[in-house]
């Protein structure tokens, strides 16, 4: 690929913003297109400063999020009725819940009342996302909540 775009507000924790990287010609064309579509933004320096801070200071925290995701998967390896990915490369875990015979929305609703929030990721999958606001203890609690719920099915 000759270009890449990434969001600074997700794992890096900036309040908003994305970076588009590529050749000077590509960036010039992208800026023109953005302006034509009404996406021009004035006084954006404060957002750029927050994104720059996140790039300079928050990258090490991503490794912690990834570690917690791997640990959570390890805690769930023996859980019933779900399939856990064998390799976790980020802070996102996609669980196959086909074995529960619940729809993703029902699965999510039942866990939400127990204090565990997930999101849908297709017709038979749910997504768990770990971020810097989640502690090691909360990861252990999430595993316990999920395993207890699955044992009751």
Indicate where each model-derived feature is located.
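Active-site C-terminal subdomain of aminotransferase-like
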Residues: 1-99
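Short, ordered loop/turn segments at secondary-structure junctions
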Residues: 9-10, 103, 123
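Short, hinge-like loop/turn segments at secondary-structure boundaries
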Residues: 21-23, 103, 137
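Hydrophobic alpha-helical packing residues
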Residues: 72, 76, 111-114, 146
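A short, conserved structural fragment
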Residues: 82, 117-118
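A structural signal for short secondary-structure junctions
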Residues: 85-89, 110, 121-123
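A C-terminal functional module that forms or caps the active site or interfaces directly
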Residues: 94-113, 119
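PLP-dependent enzyme catalytic core of the Aspartate aminotransferase-like
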Residues: 106, 114, 124-153
